[in-house]
Amino acid sequence: MQKDSEKVTYMFSNLIGFLETAIIEGTASQEENTLYEDYKLFGTIDKKSYTYKNLVHKYLKSDY
């Protein structure tokens, strides 16, 4: 059975993959592009931001 921290890490890595796919396909918003660029530069994401919360919502509703 997975620990909670492993579940969070797994979901976060899938979320980053989901975001990268959206960027490659050209379906990511400018805010999502900025979120990803900040993640690449600083290695962290502001999980309290509206963009992050919206991205999580889109990810959970997707078939990704």
Swiss-Prot record:
Source organism, top-level taxon: Bacteria
The protein's name in its UniProt record: SPbeta prophage-derived uncharacterized protein YonP
Gene source species: Bacillus subtilis (strain 168)
